[in-house]
Amino acid sequence: MTVIVTGAAGFIGANIVKALNERGESRIIAVDNLTRADKFRNLVDCEIDDYLDKTEFVERFTRGDFGKVRAVFHEGACSDTMETDGRYMMDNNFRYSRAVLDACLAQGAQFLYASSAAIYGGSTRFVEEREVEAPLNVYGYSKFLFDQVIRRVLPSAKSQIAGFRYFNVYGPRETHKGRMASVAFHNFNQFRAEGKVKLFGEYNGYAPGEQTRDFVSVEDVAKVNLFFFDHPEKSGIFNLGTGRAQPFNDIASTVVNTLRALDNLPPLTLAQQVEQGLIEYVAFPDALRGKYQCFTQADQTKLRSAGYDAPFLTVQEGVDRYVRWLSGQV
């Protein structure tokens, strides 16, 4: 049966397509918007049956043009948290997602979709409960509102609906994201260009570079998606993070040491990297004061209760792999 991936040329979508290919799935319809044409590179080493622009997909899917569809991985969205055009964001992320959901429910197709940890906003608890959800931007609100629709639909749904609140995802195939690419990606490019990585200094009680995030490898994101693909009886909204909060220092230090290893140089401690000027701290920008999350950490209780028991890569493991992959691309 056919599998559809929206946002297929994007970061997470392309990694899901590749992961499907690696297990023998190639009857894949890729859906995206290639106005930003450079995204096509993410699919060059992937096998797909067909490609559709997002503007024609929903109408054709709704009228059954693709025959029996097993599942839709709905990864397509505007993920720019700095986007201020609320009308565009709601149409692209909310209304479009509702249309894809409705078509999946009508045809009995599995619906696996990208939610976001941005739903939690400034919360200090990251559990899938309404009372801790307070998005700070229209991107987060578009995801939040769709999750509320899912909560209302789930009790009567006859086919799988699984949403994943992605935390800070990094890994291959994100180059096209520009400023919205991961910290690991930017640290890699900065070190290659300048010979050092710059991090924010002390802020809000956190020592320089010690602001923390739940950084999750896109490898693990794809694995979780495929676990639910294999278990259509499991539905719900799930946090998708490692369950660990690691500081930005860990990302930067791993980037530096991996690049040193590729040059046959020995690893350095964080203190040595700072002392040698390989990591530098800059004053926290006034523009971000009061708008910056210093801590995120996924509560994995629901995900683990659903049966996903595989370990997640640490920053040191995942970023090392990613830097080696990036080094092979340049």
UniProtKB/Swiss-Prot annotation:
Q: Which residues cross the membrane?
A: none
Identify the cofactor(s). NADP(+)
Superkingdom in the source lineage: Bacteria
Binding residue positions for NADP(+)? 11-12, 32-33, 39, 54, 75-79, 92, 143, 169, 177
* The keyword Transcription is assigned to this record: no
Quaternary structure, from the entry? Homopentamer.
PANTHER family listed in its UniProt record: ADP-L-GLYCERO-D-MANNO-HEPTOSE-6-EPIMERASE, NUCLEOSIDE-DIPHOSPHATE-SUGAR EPIMERASE
Read off the domain note: Contains a large N-terminal NADP-binding domain, and a smaller C-terminal substrate-binding domain.
UniProt-listed NCBIfam families: heptose_epim
Per its database record, what is this protein's job?
Catalyzes the interconversion between ADP-D-glycero-beta-D-manno-heptose and ADP-L-glycero-beta-D-manno-heptose via an epimerization at carbon 6 of the heptose.
Q: Output this protein's name.
A: ADP-L-glycero-D-manno-heptose-6-epimerase
